Amino acid sequence: MQQPGSIRAQIGTLVFATSLIQLANGFFGTLVSLRVAVEAFEAPGLVLSAYFAGFTLGSLRCSRLIERIGHIRAYAAFAGLVAAATAVLPLLVGSLAWVVLRAMVGFGCAGIFVTTESWLSAKALPSDRGRVFSIYMVGTFLALALGQLLIARADIKAIGPFNTIVALFALALILVTAARAEPPRASTEPALRYGVLTRTAPIAVVGCAMSGLIGGAFYALVPAWMQDQDTPRATIALFMLAAVLGGLVFQIPVGRLSDRFDRRIVLALLSLGFASTAVVMVFLPRSRSMILPTAVLLGGFMSTLYPVCVAHAHDRMPADRVVAVSGRLILVSGLGSVLGPLIGASLMARFEIDGVFYFMAAAVLVLAFVAGVGGFITSSPMHREVPFEILMPQAGPLAHDPLEASEQTHAAQ
């Protein structure tokens, strides 16, 4: 078993490397959205949604590759794929080429995140897993926010910004491959079936689905809702930034709570907090002093659902199944993020503009009920008392950029 200092160093390297990935991703999503508008592509929505299609496919297919070749080689392969596709993008300007290349980027990013999350889970002791994932989420959220700042000085028609993104992915690749690390042992078990996961950790599956639903709806539709309410654009921008900052602020405290108490109870309380805040948001005046604190609460409750669900699922599954579990949960969340805007927009069109908030509240109330029943009625299923051993590999760390989803909606409109 590795020394605690070595494990902490590996976790730190993984978090920093993936933060570089998210810094590039945040910059990349906005850059592509703006460039698509400048180039006046025939199908801008298709170009922008290709990332999510690739991400979903990657979430479905990458787990077995990671288990077959090991975490370090898989991380290098996925980061190299993203860097190569990004480098070619400014050289082949056209709708079809960009659809293919953006799908490749999404596939590679899904692989990077599955690799990272399963690696982090294996390195962290079960008693510390919530804290580790909260630090990971803080790093990725902060990097996403900083990525938006890079666009201010970027010449979107030049090749330089794309080279910057390639360099960031390359730096992340170097950090991970050059580190003295012992990644998790590759699994020889058959592919994880969804039936096994849903029977073993049903609350985690429901939670990831609901997290994707409300996350996709929030970042894609809430800006449009605020614009319909005649909210100034500067206030809309501050609202979305406040939501991201709320996600940052909540991560570590919620992670500690989920390590101390039953994660299912924590999920139920987070869901109730989000649902009540979403309903209150509908009736608030549109002054900054009222809606910005509300945005912090919404972002905080929303952004902590996914990491708590992942930690809960890994508590329930054997250590050599964490790669497959991470891949399945990312896919569930990704599908939810695709369906969320579609369902929310349909409700907004059929009923009223406030329907998006009622939809999000209803979705998390389902999770609150399921998690609450599981936490209060049944005994705790967590295996935290079992030692979590770190083993050598046989061969050879959210969700997708929510800010990009918002950009995609505006570009499509």
Task: Give residue ranges: language-model regions.
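Intracellular juxtamembrane helix-capping segments at the cytosolic ends
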Residues: 111-124, 303-317
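Helix-loop boundary and gating motifs at the non-cytosolic
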Residues: 4-52, 204, 215-225, 236
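C-terminal membrane-cytosol helix-exit motif in multi-pass small-molecule transporters
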Residues: 151-155, 166-186, 367-378
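Primarily marks hydrophobic transmembrane alpha-helices of the MFS/SLC 12-helix fold
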Residues: 72-75, 267-268
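Loop-to-transmembrane helix entry/capping segments in MFS-fold secondary transporters
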Residues: 41-45, 126-136, 233-234, 317-329
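C-terminal ends and interior cores of transmembrane alpha-helices
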Residues: 80-94, 272-286
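Helix-to-loop junctions at the C-terminal end of transmembrane segments
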Residues: 58-71, 155, 250-262, 348-349
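Intrinsic disorder in cytosolic terminal tails and internal cytosolic loops
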Residues: 1-6, 184-194, 374-413
